[in-house]
Structures are given as C-alpha cells and as structure tokens.
C-alpha cells in the first residue's frame, strides 16, 4: 500500500554533449534489417536524431546487413525501417548507407591493414581459451605475404565457413577480452538477399 502511494520522480533530461562543435557532428543508427524496429531501436533513433538536430549535425542510417548466417537480412525490413524512421522523426535520415554495398571498400581497408601487419588470418579452434589467457595465437607470427595470400583465398571462396577468420592485431592484455584480436572478417556461405554470392 505504502509503495503504491510513493511517487518517484524520474530524470528524463537528455544531457548536453561536451566539447561539441555545431555542424561538425554525425550520429549513426545501425540496425540489422532482419525485422521491424523494436521499442529499444526507436529510443536509439530518437536520441540520435535529437543530438543531430541540437548540434546541427547529420543523422546517418547504416544498415548493418553483412551477417547472412546469424541475422539474415530481409528485403522488406530495409523499407520498413526507413518508413519507421521517417514516421518517428518526421523526415528521412540525412544519409543512408548499406554495409553490403560497401564490401569492396572494406576489403580494401583490410588489405591495407594486412600490409601494415595490423591484422592476421587465423584458424585456431581454441582461440577463445588463448584470448582469455592473453596468449598469442600461433597465426600471429604469419608474414604479411602469407596473410595477404590467405585473405585473397578467403575472398575468392576457397575456405568453408568457420575455417579461417581475419583478426585485428590488438593488445592481448586489454582488460576486456572482447577487445583482444577480435574478428574483422569471417566466411559465410548463405547467399545475401541483395548481393547474392558476390562475397563469401
């Protein structure tokens, strides 16, 4: 009874961002187009749009649609999500990017990272145990040339799903194990609804 009579005041103020310059600001909303937006997504849309408007910035919709195995994209979801955002905010996003349309860009950056020895190919089955113990995987010692050759084979579809991945070379002593040599690219065999079998 007493609990029912208690009124709780909730702070619903959206706080200012510090050191933010007007007009030099972008926010990104990156849903996976495998369903309609949820209430949680809608909250993200509205907060991002609020900040974009407040600081005269851009609101960018980026469809994160490269996973055909875990969250297969649905063509209708691209359209529905865009409609939902227009309905929620009163206008279309300032820019719309589709990750699957940018695979060649991502491949180019991966090649550059490999050339700088900032990434490596790995097929360790026990990688999680190594990562959690901050132990380097044996593939970290592959040469730049070996890594580039393996990555080219990956792009050509020479490997099966789960056989090889491209990992970022990071700090193995990072406090959060998720930040240690995380996966940048992996092989997928399911066709993409927009790009088909163009990328593996």
Regions found by a protein language model. Give the residues of each.
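Active-site cores that bind ATP or allylic diphosphates and position pyrophosphate for catalysis
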Residues: 98-99, 112-200
């Amino acid at each position: 009874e007493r609990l029912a009579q208690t009124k709780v005041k909730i702070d619903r103020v959206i706080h200012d961002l510090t050191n933010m310059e007007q007009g030099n600001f972008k926010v990104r909303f990156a849903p996976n187009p495998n369903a309609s937006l949820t209430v949680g997504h809608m909250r993200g849309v509205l907060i991002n749009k609020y900040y974009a408007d407040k600081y005269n910035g851009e609101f960018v919709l980026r469809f994160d649609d490269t996973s055909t195995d875990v969250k297969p994209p649905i063509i209708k979801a691209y359209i529905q999500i865009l409609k939902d955002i227009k309905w929620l905010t009163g206008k279309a996003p300032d820019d719309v990017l589709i990750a699957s349309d940018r695979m060649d860009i991502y491949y180019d950056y991966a090649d550059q990272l490999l050339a700088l020895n900032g990434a490596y190919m790995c097929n360790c089955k026990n990688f999680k145990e190594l990562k959690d113990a901050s132990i380097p995987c044996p593939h970290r010692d592959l040469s730049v040339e070996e890594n580039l050759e393996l990555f080219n084979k990956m792009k050509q579809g020479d490997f099966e799903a789960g056989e090889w991945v491209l990992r970022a070379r990071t700090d193995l002593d990072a406090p959060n194990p998720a930040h240690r040599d995380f996966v940048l690219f992996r092989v997928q065999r399911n066709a993409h609804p927009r790009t088909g079998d163009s990328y593996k």
